[in-house]
């Protein structure tokens, strides 16, 4: 299995554009401030980068595009995002291959409400540079099934074609993962375990499609919510 290296920097956003106050500050895993270009220098030798964004934050989305463009100057990229569901891959490919326009994309792909401002620049960058853009997330209706039924077993009822859009079943689940434990604390009582399992179905599917599409001598840059 290929060695996978992750995004190990934290970006603190500062909502001011005055000369003496930067719009963002980047820290490495040791808590040391680093410049954007220092971060880029370290990241360009990695195979897999997770960019954990703050949804709907303009600075975070601007940094996503800046980092993508900078890495693309010296490395071959594969892009992917949780904001696109796996059953929409064919429609996304049609747009990337110039078979449909933006209006056509809006009819065949379930786009987030902030797509035009926050994700279209990334998709269009991939389109201009003929890069793959992988729709990694599980279809939302399947995650909803897991939540409502309270278990992964409900995914066994999917058709053979539908199962191609999720991680191979059964997939491992560890409720002791810190992120899942924190989620349980956020949703105590009824519904908490179901929410965690629904999230786990998303995580497993995203991991599956990342591993399915990662290539040697490339960087797979994945956009997802901060974790």
Tell what function each PLM region has.
Residues 55-62, 69-80, 86-96:
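Membrane-embedded segments
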Residues 36, 40, 61-68, 119-123, ...:
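Extracytoplasmic/secreted envelope proteins and their assembly/folding machinery
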Residues 54-58, 84-88, 139-143, 226-227:
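Solvent-exposed loop/turn segments at secondary-structure junctions
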């Amino acid at each position: 299995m290929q060695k996978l290296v992750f995004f190990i920097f934290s970006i603190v956003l500062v909502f001011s554009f005055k000369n003496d106050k930067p719009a963002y500050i980047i820290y490495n895993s040791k808590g040391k401030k680093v410049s954007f270009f220092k971060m880029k220098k370290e990241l360009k030798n990695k195979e897999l980068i997770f960019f954990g964004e703050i949804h709907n934050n303009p600075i975070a989305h601007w940094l996503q595009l800046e980092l993508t463009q900078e890495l693309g100057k010296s490395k071959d990229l594969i892009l992917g995002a949780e904001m696109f569901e796996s059953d929409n891959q064919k429609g996304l490919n049609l747009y990337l291959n110039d078979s449909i326009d933006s209006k056509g994309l809006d009819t065949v792909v379930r786009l987030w409400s902030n797509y035009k401002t926050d994700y279209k620049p990334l998709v269009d960058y991939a389109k201009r540079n003929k890069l793959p853009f992988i729709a990694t997330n599980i279809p939302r209706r399947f995650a909803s099934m897991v939540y409502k039924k309270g278990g992964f077993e409900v995914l066994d009822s999917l058709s053979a074609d539908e199962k191609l859009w999720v991680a191979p079943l059964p997939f491992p689940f560890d409720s002791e993962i810190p992120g899942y434990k924190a989620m349980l604390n956020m949703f105590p009582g009824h519904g908490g375990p179901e929410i965690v399992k629904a999230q786990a179905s998303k995580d497993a599917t995203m991991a599956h499609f990342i591993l399915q599409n990662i290539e040697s001598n490339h960087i797979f840059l994945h956009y997802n919510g901060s974790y």
